[in-house]
Amino acid sequence: MGLFKSWKKQEVQEKAAFSPVSGELVPLETVSDAVFAEKSLGDGVAVIPTDGSLYAPADGTIVALFPTGHALGIKTRDGVELLIHIGIDTVALNGKGFTVHVKQDDTVKKGQLLVNFDIEVLKGAGYDTVTMMLVSNGEQFGEVHKAPPGTVTAGEKIVWL
């Protein structure tokens, strides 16, 4: 009687990403940089950090790492491509205030420390510290679901597909 086996609902494995920083989760549309706010690089979330530690939002591989330490890309084990960008226009700091703990092509585990950044250095230089996490290949997975605005802790689920 295998006839009805095909009627069983196939369980779809949820693909999730967790907050890379602790702070205040805000809608991506509210950030001051139009490239992010208009989702030109992908849909996602923004967090105003309360401390300067950035952690891996999922298990995966570092596929892009800017030498300045302000941005990196991770491809998760599930094939989700995440772009994490610390601050607005912080590339201009040329790495000042950033300490990177990983290299390109490193395999990382969810919760692993990736970058330390000095919030006071960023703010003192006049930069917004809001940290964006984007799903750059979201079209492959459908809708990007996001946690509601509010206080989040690094490691808390904030995006799922």
Q: Where are the regions that the model predicts?
A:
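Contiguous, well-folded functional domains in the mature portion of proteins
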Residues: 1-161
